[in-house]
Structure formats: structure tokens, C-alpha cells
């Protein structure tokens, strides 16, 4: 089974259509996070998904396009093997040649009572 990077840019979509699209993507096992270890999980850049599949790039492209149609949206879709994603996408250098954003959200501070 191979791991693929799928980049989807929706256009002319409503918030409701976007939500439906994202729910469908998750139902088809597209992931928004990459697990680096048991206690470390990283979120992909917006519009990026990871899919582990035995399909080829064209089949994944067709499936993703069908998902977008089911949600009632038009989309530009890019698919490649995950290992190639940093080299093939033009903005790769902007995110340090990996398509992972670490969660920098501040953690709540516990105050002693």
C-alpha cells in the first residue's frame, strides 16, 4: 500500500459544501494529519490530505473528483506519492520542504489553587 499526497483547492463553494466535502473525504479515509510517533501528530497544510491506498494517482484523482461532485463543488486536484510532494509542489520551499504544520496552539496553563 502506498501513501499519497492529495491537494484539493475548492472554488465557488459555500461553507456548507466545504463541510460536506471534508466529511466525505474523511469517510473515504483521507487524513488531515500525519502521525510521526505514538505521542506526536502533525497537521497537514490547509487543502492537503494523505491517503494510503493501493490505487494509482489517476484513480485517486478520479475518486477525489467524484467526492467533490458529490459535495456539489468544483475543485482543482493534485495527486502524487507522498515522498514526491515536497519536490513537485511549487510552495514546498515555503514550508521547509515538508507539508506538515506543527500545532503551535498554546496549551492551557494549570494554575495552582
From Swiss-Prot:
Protein name: Uncharacterized protein YmfI
Gene: ymfI
